[in-house]
């Protein structure tokens, strides 16, 4: 409370306020979480004199110490305490020359804290159940406490007879469906707590089977073969009378001990001795054990074997999970635990249930578990970036009683250095990281069980940076010398590695006479050859990370040009250059005109021959196709096949094709190359079976089906067939076009296999494909329905080329193309667990996948989420290495198998199943919430835009795909803010600290500042290793 003396002082100081002194900054009221820091700012101006500042707390002058101190005119409070620091703060500015004082308006400090929650019963009767969630905590002046109610593990909301009123839960007309354990959670800025002990509500079963009996009818003796309907009065609360009590000679002699305390890991048993009279041995009697009101185990006493880890009843209030530690002994009713774990703590009660009678229960027994002292998780060593503002090392311990955590530094002086402190949760905090913080630190956890410790190594590093980056492109002539600079700084000293076309260079695999690797990282190439042309990359790295820069080397061959004559004058040289240029231009024009005329003549002759051939093959039944010149000009989206072969392979058209290869028609060569590639991908439509439509995509329907195992070839088989066909084409026709096709195809395969995986990993994938040759392959089939839509056909071909060029276990395989008739089918690899988004929703409990006797899959752990993200990064890196872009990367377009293998795919169900995630922009359906700004503004898709989408995918993974990115905004708002550059992104709450910085860099507006997939893969690999420790 503010004392009278403090009020008088404040009034006196306000009365002597100098007119020349005014506050520029006044302290503001604040709400802060307990144990965090707070700062009150205060600044006043006086043009002529020096000012002195002081602070009052609740009217009393503050006694400064290490925790509460004044820096300049500002007041700093470290580790705020709610018992001492709550109240009003006033800043006093004193003019030392005149003695005039000025007092600021009071600023209120509120402390946010949260300790515990408990469920209190306010009233219970037949018409209403009233519960209250009592919370020990405060939220200050911020948002009020958020209260959530749970029945068993189900979250409650206002619906039907359930009403949520602030801290209270009201259930009107409660019935048997409202039975269960009620708990509440409270959350604010300080954290989230759940009530340790809830309230168990169990409505009394009120049904007495009174059936009218006729003289000539008898009751069925076997209860399990007859069903009776018991109805109560209409309009009554329950409408049924209570069940009769069991006979007195059926009773529980001894129940569990009222309270037992067991150490974690030790065995124990809960007693339930009962007496069963002989006349009831043939009746159906069940022995049940309940934990916290939920059914845990039960067994029939009428002759059936004991049920271990299984039950006939699998209702929503049951805890009947598979657990070999728990055994229910039928003979004496004892429930034994092979070894106690922390989750076994609770209230236990045994029951006997005679059919058509009310159950009898033992007195409840409380089982308390003394949890072993341990670290959860184990503290790990960490690299801290030099000059980082804040860095944290976590140390969390569990045990009974709650352990105390402290940190010491190894060495002679165990005290922590300056700017290093420990918060209330045991986290070691480094502020303004410097080299003195380097060393070994030990975390000590202590309670009555003893003490445990864990030592971590803290290393202060500097991220590698280019001091002299490689600059290009570099042009040089053959036989010349080229120098490519690459110098780096960092701590530890970075290593420098050069590569050419993604193949590492070293003294062992290069010509030492021509290639020199200097100590400062510079690469010098002497006597440059034509084969030295390519893309050179310099990678620098240390324990703090990796960086890479590329430079292009262009080698110009020496021609047979005219050597300049020293004796001639400048005018002669200019005249000769002009004459040569005009002569070459004239010759080029004549050549082009002649080729155009000749190509036109040859094209007309080829069309006439092809029309004659098609007429003969059709038996003369297609005169229009043969005779109509316009019809032959139009080409389909993808050329169709006849009897499994393309028309271009017919014997009669071989001469035309051969003659056309000598022409300079770029379009003709491209179309023949595409037809040749599509011919290699041909699959018979009869090989597909059990097609089930799962949705519609941008160019047609999408199905899931099965493909005959005999039609599934390994990637190595496809390569061999391709080379064989190219060789035959080359030997048979002698055309230059087929040779270029072979060379380009082999180069594409080399590029697709040069990724983060080495050749051994590709061999392992091929071996796995051979092992599965005896089974039917699950496939995804995409139909091309919009044959006349040029944009749809172009996208269909792009996806074909993308998936055909990639041979990586992180990307689905393209098995082939069915072109026998419309619609064309693209056949892709599929998995038994389907698309990744549905899997995430199932593990989050948003999709009901539980069957009878089973439960929903548990949520993914952080290690599992990191493993999924890592596999997607590897697959996208393979796409980047093959010089392709995905353009629609999301969890809905990835698939996962039961072996937890994730692959990048392309279902793109944008028309129905995932239509909510697409928006029509500029007459095109786009996944705008996953697209980079340059894609929406300029329709520019690059690998950097795929990296932007990958950051959103990781956000989806850590949110279990339960919500859309920026779901609070409409699609139009997302487009507007993305184009304006005001769309703000933040990582998911569950993201590890080591990944936050690199994931945020995926969403920067400048694409050049975004990381590469290899950098993301390295960061994820390091995070996975940390999570496993």
Curated annotation (Swiss-Prot):
Q: Where are the transmembrane segments?
A: 578-598
Subcellular localization, as worded in the UniProt entry? Cell membrane
One example of the protein's molecular function in GO is: protein heterodimerization activity
Q: Where is this region: Disordered?
A: 613-675, 714-756
Q: Which residues carry this modification: Phosphoserine?
A: 674
Q: Which residues lie on this side of the membrane: Extracellular?
A: 19-577
Any one Pfam family here would be: I-set
Q: Which GO terms describe its biological process?
A: cell adhesion; dendrite self-avoidance; homophilic cell adhesion via plasma membrane adhesion molecules; imaginal disc-derived female genitalia morphogenesis; imaginal disc-derived male genitalia morphogenesis; internal genitalia morphogenesis; negative regulation of canonical Wnt signaling pathway; photoreceptor cell axon guidance
What's any one GO cellular component for it? axon
Domain Ig-like C2-type as annotated: residue spans: 21-110, 109-195, 247-361, 364-459, 464-554
Disulfide linkage: 42-91, 133-184, 272-350, 395-443, 486-538
Membrane association type: Single-pass type I membrane protein
Q: Which residues lie on this side of the membrane: Cytoplasmic?
A: 599-1029
Q: Polar residues bias: where?
A: 651-669
Q: Cross-referenced InterPro entries, in alphabetical order?
A: Ig-like_dom, Ig-like_dom_sf, Ig-like_fold, Ig_I-set, Ig_sub, Ig_sub2, Kinase-like_dom_sf, Prot_kinase_dom
Basic and acidic residues biased stretches: 716-727
* Domain Protein kinase: residue ranges: 688-1024
Glycoprotein as a keyword of this entry, yes or no, is yes
Transmembrane helix as a keyword?
yes
Assembly, per entry? Interacts with plexA; component of a receptor complex that mediates the repulsive signaling in response to Semaphorin ligands.
Q: Supply the name of the protein.
A: Tyrosine-protein kinase-like otk
UniProt organism field: Drosophila simulans (Fruit fly)
- What are the leading ranks of the lineage? Eukaryota, Metazoa, Ecdysozoa, Arthropoda, Hexapoda
Q: What is this protein's gene name?
A: otk
């Amino acid at each position: 409370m503010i004392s009278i003396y403090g009020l008088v002082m404040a009034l006196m100081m306000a009365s002597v306020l100098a007119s020349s002194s005014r506050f520029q900054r006044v302290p503001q009221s604040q709400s802060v979480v307990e144990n965090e820091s707070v700062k009150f700012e205060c600044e006043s101006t006086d043009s002529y004199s020096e000012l002195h500042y002081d602070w009052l707390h609740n009217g009393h002058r503050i006694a400064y110490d290490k925790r509460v101190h004044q820096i300049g005119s500002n007041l700093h409070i470290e580790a705020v305490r709610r018992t001492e620091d709550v109240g009003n703060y006033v800043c006093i500015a004193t003019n030392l020359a005149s003695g005039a004082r000025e007092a600021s308006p009071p600023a209120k400090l509120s402390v946010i804290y949260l300790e515990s929650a408990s469920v209190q019963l306010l009233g219970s009767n037949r018409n209403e159940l009233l519960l209250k969630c009592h919370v020990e905590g405060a939220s200050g002046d911020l948002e009020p406490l958020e209260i959530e109610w749970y029945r068993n593990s189900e979250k409650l909301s206002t619906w039907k007879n359930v009403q949520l009123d602030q801290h209270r839960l009201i259930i009107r007309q409660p019935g048997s469906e409202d039975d269960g354990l009620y708990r509440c959670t409270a959350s604010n800025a300080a954290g989230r707590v759940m009530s340790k002990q809830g309230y168990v509500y169990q409505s009394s079963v009120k049904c007495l089977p009174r059936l009218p009996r006729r003289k000539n009818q008898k009751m069925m003796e076997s209860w399990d073969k007859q069903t009776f309907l018991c109805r109560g009065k209409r309009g009554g609360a329950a409408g049924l009378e209570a069940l009769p009590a069991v006979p007195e000679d059926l009773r529980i002699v001894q129940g569990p001990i009222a309270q037992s305390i067991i150490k974690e890991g030790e065995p124990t048993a809960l007693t339930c001795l009962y007496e069963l009279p002989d006349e009831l041995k043939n009746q159906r009697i069940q022995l049940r054990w309940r934990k916290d009101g939920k059914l845990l185990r039960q067994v029939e006493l009428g002759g059936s074997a004991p049920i271990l880890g299984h039950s006939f009843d699998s209702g929503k209030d049951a805890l009947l999970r598979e657990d070999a530690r728990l055994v229910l002994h039928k003979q004496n009713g004892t429930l034994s635990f092979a070894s106690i774990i922390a989750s076994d703590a609770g209230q236990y009660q045994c029951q006997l249930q005679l059919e058509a009678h009310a159950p009898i229960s033992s007195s409840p027994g409380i089982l308390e578990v003394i949890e072993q002292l341990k670290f959860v998780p184990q503290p790990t060593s960490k690299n801290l970036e030099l000059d980082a503002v804040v860095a944290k090392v976590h140390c969390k311990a569990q045990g009974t009683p709650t352990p105390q955590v402290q940190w010491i530094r190894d060495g002679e002086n165990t005290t922590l250095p300056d700017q290093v402190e420990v918060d209330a949760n045991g986290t070691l905090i480094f502020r303004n990281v410097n080299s003195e913080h380097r060393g070994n630190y030990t975390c000590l956890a202590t309670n009555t069980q003893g003490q445990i410790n864990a030592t971590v190594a803290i290393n202060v590093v500097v991220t590698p940076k280019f001091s002299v980056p490689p600059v290009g492109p570099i042009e040089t002539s053959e036989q010349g010398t080229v120098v490519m600079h690459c110098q780096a700084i960092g701590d530890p000293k970075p290593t420098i590695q050069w590569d050419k076309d993604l193949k590492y260079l070293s003294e062992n695999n290069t010509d030492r006479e021509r290639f020199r690797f200097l100590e400062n990282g510079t690469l010098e190439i002497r006597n440059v050859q034509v084969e030295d042309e390519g893309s050179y990359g310099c990678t620098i790295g240390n324990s703090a990370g990796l960086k890479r820069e590329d430079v292009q080397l262009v080698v110009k061959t020496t021609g047979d040009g005219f050597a300049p004559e020293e004796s001639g004058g400048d005018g002669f040289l200019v005249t000769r250059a002009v004459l040569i240029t005009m002569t070459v231009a004239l010759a080029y024009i004549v050549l082009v005109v002649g080729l155009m005329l000749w190509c036109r003549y040859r094209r007309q002759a080829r069309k006439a021959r092809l029309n004659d051939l098609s007429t003969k093959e059709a038996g003369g039944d297609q005169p229009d196709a043969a005779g109509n010149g316009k019809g032959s000009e139009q080409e389909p989206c993808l050329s169709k096949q006849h009897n499994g072969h393309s028309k271009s392979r017919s014997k009669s058209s071989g001469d035309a094709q051969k003659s056309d290869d000598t022409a300079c028609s770029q379009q003709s060569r491209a179309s023949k190359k595409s037809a040749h590639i599509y011919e290699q991908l041909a699959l018979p439509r009869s090989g597909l079976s059990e097609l089930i439509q799962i949705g519609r995509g941008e160019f047609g329907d999408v199905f899931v089906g099965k493909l005959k195992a005999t039609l599934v070839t390994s990637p190595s088989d496809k390569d061999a067939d391709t080379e064989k066909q190219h060789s035959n084409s080359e030997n048979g026709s002698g055309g230059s076009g087929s040779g270029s096709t072979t060379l380009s195809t082999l180069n594409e395969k080399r590029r697709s296999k040069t990724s983060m995986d080495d050749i051994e990993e590709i061999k392992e994938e091929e071996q796995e494909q051979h092992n599965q040759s005896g089974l039917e392959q699950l496939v995804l089939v995409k139909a091309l329905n919009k044959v006349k839509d040029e944009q749809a056909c172009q996208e269909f071909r792009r996806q074909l080329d993308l998936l055909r060029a990639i041979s990586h276990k992180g990307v689905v395989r393209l098995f082939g193309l069915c072109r026998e008739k419309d619609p064309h089918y693209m056949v892709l690899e599929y998995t038994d667990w389907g698309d990744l988004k549905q899997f995430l929703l199932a593990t989050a409990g948003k999709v009901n996948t539980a069957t009878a006797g089973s439960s929903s899959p548990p949520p993914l752990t952080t290690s599992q989420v990191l493993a999924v993200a890592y596999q997607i990064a590897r697959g996208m890196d393979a796409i980047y290495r093959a010089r392709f872009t995905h353009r629609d990367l999301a969890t809905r377009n990835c698939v996962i198998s039961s072996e937890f293998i994730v692959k990048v795919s392309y279902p793109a169900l944008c028309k129905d199943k995932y239509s909510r995630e697409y928006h029509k922009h500029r007459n095109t359906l786009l996944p705008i919430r996953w697209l980079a700004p340059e894609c929406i503004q300029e329709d520019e898709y690059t690998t950097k835009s795929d990296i932007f989408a990958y950051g959103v995918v990781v956000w989806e993974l850590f949110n279990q795909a339960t919500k859309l990115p920026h779901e609070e905004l409409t699609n139009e708002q997302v487009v507007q803010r993305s184009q304006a550059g005001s769309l703000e992104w933040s990582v998911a709450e569950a993201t590890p600290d080591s990944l936050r910085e690199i994931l945020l860099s995926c969403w920067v507006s400048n694409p050049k500042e975004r990381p590469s997939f290899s950098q993301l893969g390295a960061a994820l690999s390091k995070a996975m290793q940390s999570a496993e420790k």
